[in-house]
Amino acid sequence: MNIMFCGDRGVCQGIFLSALSICKNIIEPINFYILTASVEGHQPITQEFANKMELILQTKNNQHRVILFDISDRFQSYLPLANMNTRFTPMCMLRLFADMVAEIQEKVLYLDTDVLCYEEFGEMYEMDMSDYEIAGVPDRYGKWFFGNALKHNYLNSGVLLLNMKKIRETSLFEKCREMCRDRKMFMPDQTALNKLARKRKIPSRYNNQGDMREDTVFKHFTTSFRFLPRFEVVTVKPWQVNKMHDELGIFEFDDIIEEYKGVQNDEQRDSDLLYN
């Protein structure tokens, strides 16, 4: 099984938490791919972090692997110039370079770093993707405003099953990179994927963007809106433990949080968002 994360040094905590939650629910060997890059304002993830994460994960299965790819040179050649001065975070675009990493073969499950696994997902991972480039869940809010509002086919890109073989055949990611470079868009990487990809829609339990449900497989800690008693924008990430408890009423991942705490040394605790 192949899992992919992307980002800079600021998301290491999210990657580690997500990986721990996956290993709790999947017993087979997993390749965890991490794509990172050095861009102005962003420090790349270090090999030291990847090595430590692999060492911890191998206590659960000694065949788990963590493979770090620094794609700074390739990223610089496709900088999303049209979107660099927007709210867009360029690190989100790193996943669109997976086709340029030869080691990432066949099928890979991409996860945002604020996604935690709650149940086993083998059935989803093994679904037939022969006719599709990507599979995902409709975006909780975007499905009403983008794509086909009747079909709800505008996907949230936080959990995506990627058919890398087909993506390379169709040059999907190359087309998306060019679109992000040349055209100013709202959430450019997600918009480009939705516009250009041949996509398969899957049940919402595989990317639950709302309240926890009994059938939740992946919980995605996205920004949400509350309308009563007053309008409020709510953004809570899984490493914000008190807010996760008090504002979201989510306690289902406390064992993962405690495990994460247990593998940090004192120096890391002092600099870790979880403790600040």
Region annotations inferred by a language model:
Residues T46-M100:
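Active-site-proximal specificity loops/subdomain of glycosyltransferases
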Residues S72, M91-R140, Y154, L161-L162:
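GT-A fold catalytic core of metal-dependent nucleotide-sugar glycosyltransferases
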Residues I3-D8:
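A conserved hydrophobic helix/loop-capping motif in glycosyltransferases and polysaccharide synthases
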Residues C12-I27:
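Histidine-anchored nucleotide/phosphate-binding helix
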